[in-house]
Design a protein with these regions (language model features):
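Active-site helix of classical SDR
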Residues: 133, 169
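Alpha-helical segment proximal to the catalytic Tyr-Lys
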Residues: 138, 182-183
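A glycine-rich helix->loop->beta "capping" turn
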Residues: 3-4, 52-57, 77-90, 96-97, ...
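Conserved glycine-rich Rossmann-like NAD(P)H-binding loop of the short-chain dehydrogenase/reductase
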Residues: 28-44
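Canonical Rossmann dinucleotide-binding motif of NAD(H)/NADP(H)-dependent dehydrogenases/reductases
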Residues: 2-33
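The beta1-alpha1 cofactor-binding region of Rossmann-like NAD(H)/NADP(H)-dependent oxidoreductases
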Residues: 39-40, 62-73, 115
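Catalytic Tyr-X3-Lys loop
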Residues: 94, 106-130, 145, 149, ...
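C-terminal helical subdomain
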Residues: 186, 193-194, 211-280
């Protein structure tokens, strides 16, 4: 199968990073099912794609990832339009501003988080990626080709004061990514993590945060590394995490990957637990 025949599902596709990922994959010639809960945002993405004369390769799916039923609906609709799903990009995110918009000035304490807020972050950042991956991986393994890219976050954000929901739920996805990569070793299905590498100019960072938007990382930095990670050329790359801001598009992709990459979950700096030998 040529790369142009492949199909990707991208969650959180209506704006910010997700929008750039969708446009980048379409620009590469892939077919994309763009998933988001925001109908207006999806319509704007579709309009931008039509202006680029790539509308035939895009479908939009309005779905709420906190609903268990949404997983089957997304997969069914995407397969109904495009057939086999080859690529999954778990990008959907919920920002700390949904808990409180002045979080940067007055960091949220963990005891201020309601059970409903906690469940929302875990559902979107951890449970939905697991459920979508579980639904799609059997077919990927059957065809001996698949790509899963999980958008987590930087270590500093995982443990930052004021991030008691966003950080832990993204950290769980990071750990899950490492396990996924090990489970899928030798199957032709790769699992990698891609993050911007810092505070990024998206709607998840409210104006109240006080940043100069022009000085923030721009979402478009995610496109070059993603396009390479979902290619045939990256078939031997799995269990890695990449900081898009350190990806140098002027270098050959393999060199850029070496510069911007590290093991998922920072296992190279971890002291692993002592495990005694097993009998038998």
């Amino acid at each position: 199968m040529s790369e142009q025949q492949r199909v990707a599902i991208v969650t959180g596709a209506a704006g910010g990073i997700g929008r750039e990922l969708v446009l980048g994959l379409l620009g590469k010639g892939l077919k994309v099912a763009a998933v988001d809960r925001t109908a207006q945002g999806l319509a704007e993405v579709a309009q931008a794609v039509q202006q680029r004369q790539q509308g035939a390769n895009l479908m939009t799916i309005e779905a709420d990832l906190t609903r268990d039923e949404s997983i089957d609906e997304i997969v069914s609709k995407a397969r109904g339009r495009f057939g086999m799903i080859d690529i999954l990009v778990n990008n959907a995110g919920v920002g700390q501003a949904t808990v409180r918009s002045d979080n940067r000035q007055h960091p949220i304490k963990f005891w201020e988080v309601s059970p409903e807020q906690w469940k929302l972050f875990v559902a979107v950042h951890t449970s939905a990626p697991m459920a979508l991956s579980r639904a799609l991986v059997p077919d990927m393994m059957h065809q001996k080709w698949g790509r899963i890219v999980n958008v987590t976050t930087s270590l500093g954000t995982m443990i930052r004061e004021g991030s008691p929901t966003y950080g832990p739920s993204k950290a769980a996805l990071e750990a899950f990514s490492a396990i996924m990569a090990k489970d899928l070793t030798g199957t032709g299905v790769t699992v990698n993590v891609l993050v911007p590498g810092g505070v990024t100019n998206t709607g998840m960072v409210p104006l109240e945060a006080g940043y100069d938007r022009a000085e923030m990382i721009q979402p478009a930095v995610m496109t070059p590394p993603l396009n390479w990670l979902v290619s045939d050329a990256a078939g031997g790359v799995t269990g890695r995490r990449f900081l898009a801001v350190h990806w140098d598009p002027s270098l050959p992709p393999e060199e850029a990957a070496a510069k911007a990459g590290a093991p998922v979950a920072w296992t190279e700096i971890a002291t692993m637990p002592i495990e005694p030998p097993r009998r038998g």
